[in-house]
């Protein structure tokens, strides 16, 4: 109400912001676009007027974005294979538009570039008069190195490896940004050590209130996009190293599982695979599970599925790479030794998630993982 009155009578100056997104951020159905969509929503609710620019490659135009933005523009991503021959990373050179550049240059509003992917024009002279900020979602060359190590196909492995080298060199473009909003504490430490002007602004997400159910569930859940090599490896690890040693039931939920994963599931009577499943159905499984088990072997950025599990689920188990330096360690059962993982499973599977557990988990609502907290931090950085 206070914002409305001030805005109506021009008591405060309207804040306007260009956001350049690497993809159309709706539906908010994977890590990167979840952060972008709920950031846009939070900024809109805080009174920031957003001019959104989206690179598009296979996702539909999203009219819902117009509810939160004063203008929305779409730009076709250039997927020409000739771009692979350039020194600029393909994920960057394929997101380049003169029309976008001209629109950005036409006013004095600040710009938030979403990810290193969108930074091809960061140092362009046409926008040197503008305040420019970058939201980093990963240390991209580390992320691509991890993808390369996790990939079994030679052609993809080679692509990720070459892209990682190019991204490491391209990263220096960040010197042209007035500020960087790093998604994780580890990324923030790295960027500041490199001399970039970075602050930690954690991931934006769909959760505002803890919605965990008390009582017991009757299965353990692992969820993730199974087409991503990192998640495929984590699911196989659980099957081969943990659930082969216990009869506790496991559900693996996620689309596009590999043939190898399907074969492994068929060998384990206590494991079920749900692979034609919507986000809404996954959230229901997160809520119903007794334990959400989320290991990772790629400690980059912050895993939004961990936040989802903590806001919506009962007990959460993870390895140290999933939670290291996140501030979420105290809310999880953290273990790296597989024998102790099995012991913890058999202990917590029969425990009540009680009122005291629920109240303890509620601390997250008012922490650095709340959207309102991070929105204020971002506004302070940009304006």
Task: Identify the meaning behind each predicted range.
Residues 2-70, 106-107, 244:
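N-terminal subdomain of nucleotide-sugar transferases
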Residues 95-98, 350-383:
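A charged, aromatic-enriched C-terminal amphipathic alpha-helix characteristic of glycosyltransferases
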Residues 128-150:
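Active-site proximal beta-strand in glycosyltransferases
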Residues 160-210:
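Donor nucleotide-sugar binding/catalytic pocket of nucleotide-sugar-dependent glycosyltransferases
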Residues 286-301, 312-314:
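Acidic donor-binding loop of glycosyltransferase active sites
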């Amino acid at each position: 109400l206070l914002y409305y009155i001030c805005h109506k009578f021009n008591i405060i100056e309207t804040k306007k912001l260009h956001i350049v997104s690497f993809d159309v951020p709706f539906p908010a159905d994977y890590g990167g676009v979840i952060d972008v969509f709920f950031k846009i929503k939070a900024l809109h609710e805080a009174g920031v007027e957003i001019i959104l620019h989206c690179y598009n490659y296979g996702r539909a135009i999203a009219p819902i974005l117009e509810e939160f933005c004063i203008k929305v523009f779409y730009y076709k991503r250039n997927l020409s294979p000739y771009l692979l021959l350039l020194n600029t990373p393909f994920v960057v050179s394929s997101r380049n538009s003169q029309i976008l550049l001209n629109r950005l240059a036409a006013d004095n509003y600040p710009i938030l570039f979403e990810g290193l992917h969108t930074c091809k024009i960061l140092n362009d002279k046409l926008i040197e008069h503008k305040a420019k900020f970058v939201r980093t979602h990963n240390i991209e060359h580390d992320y691509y190195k991890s993808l390369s190590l996790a990939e079994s196909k030679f052609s993809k492995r080679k692509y990720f490896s070459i892209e990682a080298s190019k991204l490491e060199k391209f990263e220096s473009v960040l010197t042209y940004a007035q500020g960087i909003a790093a998604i994780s504490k580890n990324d923030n430490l790295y960027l500041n050590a490199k001399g970039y002007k970075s602050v930690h602004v954690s991931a934006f997400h769909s959760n505002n209130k803890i919605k965990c159910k008390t009582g017991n569930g009757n299965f353990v859940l692992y969820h993730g996009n199974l087409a991503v090599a990192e998640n495929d490896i984590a699911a196989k690890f659980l099957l081969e190293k943990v659930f082969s040693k216990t009869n506790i039931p496991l559900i693996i939920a996620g689309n596009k599982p590999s043939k190898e994963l399907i074969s492994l599931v068929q060998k384990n009577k206590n494991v079920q695979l749900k692979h034609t499943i919507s986000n809404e159905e996954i959230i229901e499984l997160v809520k119903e599970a007794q334990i959400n088990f989320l290991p990772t072997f790629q400690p980059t950025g912050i895993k939004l599925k961990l936040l989802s599990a903590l806001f919506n689920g009962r007990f959460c188990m993870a390895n140290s790479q999933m939670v290291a330096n996140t501030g979420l360690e105290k809310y999880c059962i953290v273990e790296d030794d597989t024998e102790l993982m099995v012991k913890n499973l058999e202990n917590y599977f029969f425990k009540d998630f009680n009122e005291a557990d629920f109240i303890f988990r509620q601390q997250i609502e008012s922490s650095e993982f709340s959207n309102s907290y991070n929105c204020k931090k971002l506004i302070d950085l940009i304006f």
